[in-house]
């Protein structure tokens, strides 16, 4: 179980990375900021940071408009 943007989410994989999580929400090609347990994770680390049970993840993505 993860907490994603304030909501409990069942993560279907035993293991996975932030990159896997972004792909599952079709955000891998978007400009996002990811925070894991109050630490901002740089994009260059998305493929190596493993998700753990009870991680608290915040994903912020930007939407254009005017």
UniProtKB/Swiss-Prot annotation:
GO terms for cellular component: adenylyltransferase complex. The keyword Nucleotide-binding applies. C-terminal thiocarboxylation occurs in 2 steps, it is first acyl-adenylated (-COAMP) by ThiF, then thiocarboxylated (-COSH) by ThiI. Pathway: Cofactor biosynthesis; thiamine diphosphate biosynthesis. GO terms for biological process: thiamine biosynthetic process; thiamine diphosphate biosynthetic process; thiazole biosynthetic process. One of its GO terms (molecular function) is nucleotide binding. Keywords: Nucleotide-binding, Phosphoprotein, Thiamine biosynthesis. The modification Glycyl adenylate is found at residue 66. Is the sulfur donor in the synthesis of the thiazole phosphate moiety of thiamine phosphate. Forms heterodimers with ThiG. This is Sulfur carrier protein ThiS. It comes from Bacillus subtilis (strain 168).
């Amino acid at each position: 179980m993860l907490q994603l943007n304030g909501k409990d989410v069942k993560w279907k994989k035993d293991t996975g990375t932030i990159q896997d999580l972004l792909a599952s929400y079709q955000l891998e090609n978007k400009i996002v900021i990811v925070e894991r347990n109050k630490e901002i994770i740089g994009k260059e680390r998305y493929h190596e940071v493993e998700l753990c049970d009870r991680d608290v993840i915040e994903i912020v993505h930007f939407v254009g408009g005017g």
